Design a protein with these regions (language model features):
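The start of beta-strands in P-loop NTPase/AAA+ ATPase cores
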Residues: 35, 54-55, 126-128, 160
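Acidic catalytic patch
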Residues: 2, 165-166
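Conserved anion-binding
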Residues: 6-9, 47, 53, 64-140
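Short, charge-dense linear interaction motifs
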Residues: 142-144
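Glycine-rich, proline-tolerant flexible connector loops at the mouths of alpha/beta enzymes
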Residues: 1-24, 134-140
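Alpha-helix-loop-beta-strand connector modules within alpha/beta enzyme cores
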Residues: 11-39, 44, 48, 76-86, ...
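Nucleotide/phosphate-binding site architecture used for ATP/NTP-dependent chemistry
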Residues: 61
């Protein structure tokens, strides 16, 4: 469940607006179902309130780079977290045609650094899922997403669950 788009050309949503979009929905779903709920946010306060409302996990498109308090919230709640690769360090991706010498080497280096950061901030590795950030999160050039799919087994070196989205 997400209350703020991260796609190219999207605009910022205030904290209050994002909370108004996601918290009532999480609460409603939780009263009717035990289905697994992941909140898509880069904001620590949204993550905190979503977890309090019944969300089970946090999907952070900034991989803990967008809000300095996010790692603290994840560690405090011992919540599963999805760390997504993005060529852009902000919560918005661009249509930039990024080129790579080796896209998988870039992803592996990124995840090594992000995993070290997460563990240094009290997030146990068993709580982490990695997402190579397909589409514009990698590049405006589709060939890099296809290369990631072809070589996805190289990310098994992290011994972590993988999440791939269209």
């Amino acid at each position: 469940i997400g209350g703020e788009s991260s796609g190219p050309g999207s605009t910022d949503v205030s904290l209050d607006e994002e909370l108004q979009r996601v918290i009532p929905l999480i609460q409603k779903i939780r009263t009717e179902s035990e289905i697994w709920i992941s909140v898509d946010t880069w904001k620590a306060e949204v993550a905190r309130q979503a977890l309090e409302a019944g969300a089970d996990a946090v999907n952070d498109v900034t991989a803990l780079r967008g809000d300095t308090e996010m790692a603290k919230v994840i560690a405090e709640y011992q919540a599963p977290v999805i760390l997504m690769f993005s060529k852009d360090s902000s919560a918005r991706t661009s249509k930039q045609d990024t080129d790579y010498v080796d896209v998988l080497d870039t992803l592996k280096s990124f995840f090594r650094e992000r995993l070290e950061f997460a563990e240094l901030h009290g997030i146990h590795k068993s709580k982490i899922v990695i997402d190579p950030g397909m589409g514009f999160f990698i590049s405006g050039k589709a060939k890099y997403s296809f290369e990631v799919i072809r070589r996805i087994s190289e990310l098994h070196e992290f011994a972590l669950p993988l999440l791939l989205g269209p």
